[in-house]
Amino acid sequence: RLTSVTGVQTCALPIWIADRYKNEPVILGYELFNEPIAPYFENMEELNGKLEDVYKKGVAAIREVDSNHIILLGGAQWNGNFKPFKDSKFDDKIMYTCHRYGGEPTQAAIQTIINFRDSVNLPMYMGEIGHNTDEWQAAFCQTMRENNIGYTFWPYKKMDGSSFVGITPPENWANIVYFSEAPRATYKEIREARPAQAMSRKAMMDFIEACKLKNCVVQEGYIRSLGMK
């Protein structure tokens, strides 16, 4: 819980990254935290109240070495809640970033995000979309274009159709998945669920081979759904 311990806050500040890339024009900017403060945290509201202050500390630390780049601030609860933010003027090169994977692909579904964007008069960037049907994604991309919200997809590569390229599961991969999801409250349960070591090693090596681009399947429908060719 990065916003609850001062020492962790200090360690988390990405000063070394900013120092390394401060003169690199290909870098859009730095996102301080990815999806901070999960909705299942027992002290969620308390942490929400501290988030903006932690962001201010992070921005100030970066500005010690880099005054060039934009800094992206993600909302609380999967980058979706922007109510904790009260001060959008503490730096002149910040923008906000949101994520969305489900719900209706309509403007009404993201109206609160649009309203926040308009109220602070700063850009809103949809940093992650994906994990849905091609039809949903095409409709949602259209909604974002109509509302002047830039977006990127996630991920580029995975084991189903909701990505640019798909990985074909290797032989015995189902056994690896079963082991990862099996009960493991005791060592007995772990031993009983564990697949043979030789088979597991071969499945993992085959997975690495399957991940190579030359062995992946290009998902044409997914690419079209993003408005790309």
Task: Map each language-model feature to its residues.
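Extracellular glycoside hydrolase catalytic/binding regions
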Residues: 15-158, 163-180
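Extended, alpha-helix-rich binding/interface surfaces that flank or overlap catalytic cores
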Residues: 143, 147-229
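Single conserved hydrophobic/aromatic residue that forms the stacking wall/gate
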Residues: 1-7, 11
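General structural signal for secondary-structure boundaries
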Residues: 9-12, 133, 215, 219-220
